[in-house]
Swiss-Prot record:
It comes from the Bacteria. Its EC number is 1.6.5.10. NADPH-specific quinone reductase. The gene is mdaB. It comes from Escherichia coli O157:H7. It is found in: Cytoplasm. This is NADPH:quinone oxidoreductase MdaB. One of its GO terms (molecular function) is NADPH dehydrogenase (quinone) activity. Belongs to the oxidoreductase MdaB family. The lineage of its organism: Bacteria, Pseudomonadati, Pseudomonadota, Gammaproteobacteria, Enterobacterales.
Length: 193
């Protein structure tokens, strides 16, 4: 089976206690272990060891990013984790931007060293799904993955490939934790079962 690293981006802040992301991390941990996978979990808002986190990325076949949507993207603690770990991973997670002075025609973003690995986003948002998918709504129909394009590209810069994104919507205005956990279990079984 696979080695799966879960980055838990939950954070207590303002009106959010991070409980839903903690719950979904627990759901993923239990479901994936039941399916026979090895799982490691790190909390982005912790005193992680940067060198150990690079080794976690090398160990993992799949990285799951569990996080809330804050101000149209990842929480700053998740971005800090990426900045710390990906930068430390120069030479092991990526070699360069893919181009050289001798051959600048090579494609930018092709210097990743972890080809064959995959990543998945698991997101929680107060916005309803139609805010992402309908052209006359807030995100003008670009979809969830369109909103997360820079986040996807950061992972793809390392050479990783995306798995289908999971999102729990309307988590503050219309919370339904039993539905979210059941839908997430189903999503995980479809991908990793």
């Amino acid at each position: 089976m696979s080695n799966i690293l879960i980055i838990n981006g939950a954070k207590k802040f303002a009106h959010s206690n991070g409980q839903l992301n903690d719950t979904l991390t627990e759901v993923a941990d239990g479901t994936l272990r039941d399916l026979g996978h090895d799982v490691r979990i790190v909390r982005a808002d912790s005193d992680y060891d940067v060198k150990a986190e690079v080794q976690n990325f090398l160990w993992a076949d799949v990285v799951i990013w569990q996080m809330p949507g804050w101000w149209m993207g990842a929480p700053w603690t998740v971005k800090k984790y990426i900045d710390d770990v990906f930068t430390e991973g120069h030479g092991t997670l990526y070699a360069s931007d893919g181009r050289t002075r001798k051959d600048p025609s090579k494609k930018y973003g092709s210097g990743g060293l972890v080809q064959g690995k995959k990543y998945m986003l698991s997101l929680t948002w107060n916005a309803p799904m139609e805010a992402f998918t309908e052209k006359d709504q807030f995100f003008h129909g670009v979809g969830v993955d369109g909103v997360y394009l820079p986040f996807h590209k950061a992972n793809q810069f390392l050479g990783m490939e995306p798995l289908p994104t999971f999102i729990a919507n309307d988590v503050i205005k219309m919370p339904d934790v039993p539905r979210y956990t059941e839908e997430y279990r189903k999503h995980l079984v479809e991908i990793f079962g």
